[in-house]
């Protein structure tokens, strides 16, 4: 038995256990519950540890359309092994993004793996606006 499994057995009574599909996850019992009715949206850079740090990425690539898109070779990992910047909504990778620069604006081009809802797109727009404020530039969001 590995050290990790021994440690898990010794501390499991102090951990919160959650089973999703056929995978068991453990976490702190002190982790606050997620805020209901509020999405989290992140524009992650290429090679972010959220994807690169795990061999099994099924939890963050769980959507059927996302898996089909990725398996087609069109997204996330390019043929040269480079990871594309991804958009993550509520923990799931739902598209890729890239930035281009015009004379006056940063243009964020979003490629969706599956059609995002109106609420998701509104939240993405808010994140893109904050991105522009951080870089002190106006932003334009283009959606593929």
Where are these regions (language model features)?
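Long, charged, low-complexity, helical-prone intrinsically disordered regions
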Residues: 1-144
């Amino acid at each position: 038995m590995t050290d990790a499994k021994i440690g898990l057995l010794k501390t499991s009574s102090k951990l919160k256990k959650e089973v999703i599909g056929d995978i068991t996850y453990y976490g702190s019992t002190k982790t606050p519950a997620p805020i209901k009715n509020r999405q989290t949206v992140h524009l992650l850079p290429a090679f972010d540890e959220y994807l690169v740090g795990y061999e099994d990425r099924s939890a963050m690539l769980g959507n059927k359309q996302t898996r089909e898109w990725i398996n087609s070779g069109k997204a996330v990992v390019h043929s040269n092994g480079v990871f594309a910047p991804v958009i993550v909504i509520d923990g799931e990778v739902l598209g890729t993004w890239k930035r281009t620069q015009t004379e006056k604006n940063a243009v964020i081009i979003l490629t969706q793996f599956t059609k995002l809802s109106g609420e998701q797109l509104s939240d993405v727009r808010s994140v893109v606006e904050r991105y522009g404020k951080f870089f002190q530039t106006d932003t334009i969001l283009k959606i593929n």
